[in-house]
């Protein structure tokens, strides 16, 4: 058995930690949603500014970009055709009915 210290004689034996102030229920969640709301608001504001910048293009610039996009798509279609042709030629060359 432990002997009580002279320093601890006047104090209660078990020290109970003090409780923090009681917060209203849901305050933490409310603060978190406010923070998330602010972040989403700032992000949407930045996206809106970017959209506004794109809306100020002239019609000529938009049609030029559209033409460039169409040209790129045509190039992709042509490359796909070439790959299909090469693949089918390679496959047919292996399917010979007689050995070489």
UniProtKB/Swiss-Prot annotation:
Domain of life from the UniProt record: Eukaryota
One record GO biological process: negative regulation of NF-kappaB transcription factor activity
Location in the cell: Nucleus
Q: Where is the composition biased (Basic and acidic residues)?
A: 1-32
Task: Specify where it is mainly localized.
Answer: nucleus
Q: Could you tell me which InterPro entries the record lists for this protein? A: TF_A-like/BEX (IPR021156)
Q: In which tissues is it expressed?
A: Highly expressed in normal and fetal brain tissues, and weakly expressed in uterus and ovary. Down-regulated in epithelial ovarian, cervical, prostate, breast, brain and lung cancer cell lines and in brain and ovarian tumors.
What does the record list as coiled-coil region(s)? 60-88
What keywords are assigned to this protein? Coiled coil, Nucleus, Repressor, Transcription, Transcription regulation
Region: Disordered, residue numbers: 1-34
Q: Which GO terms describe its cellular component?
A: nucleoplasm; nucleus
Q: Spell out the family assignment given in the record's similarity comment.
A: Belongs to the TFS-II family. TFA subfamily.
Function, in words: Plays a role in the negative regulation of NF-kappa-B signaling at the basal level by modulating transcriptional activity of NF-kappa-B on its target gene promoters. Associates with cyclin D1 promoter containing Myc E-box sequence and transcriptionally represses cyclin D1 expression. Regulates telomerase reverse transcriptase expression and telomerase activity in both ALT (alternative lengthening of telomeres)and telomerase-positive cell lines.
Query: Would you tell me the protein name for this molecule?
Result: Transcription elongation factor A protein-like 7
Source organism per UniProt: Homo sapiens
């Amino acid at each position: 058995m432990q002997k009580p210290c002279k320093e601890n004689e006047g104090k209660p034996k078990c020290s109970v930690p003090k409780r923090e102030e009681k917060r209203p229920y849901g305050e933490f969640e409310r603060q978190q949603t406010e923070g998330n709301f602010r972040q989403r608001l700032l992000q949407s504001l930045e996206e809106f500014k970017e959209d506004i910048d794109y809306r100020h293009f002239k019609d000529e610039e938009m049609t030029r970009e559209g033409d460039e996009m169409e040209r790129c798509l045509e190039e992709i279609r042509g490359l796909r055709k070439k790959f299909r042709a090469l693949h089918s030629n390679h496959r047919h060359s292996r399917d010979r009915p007689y050995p070489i």
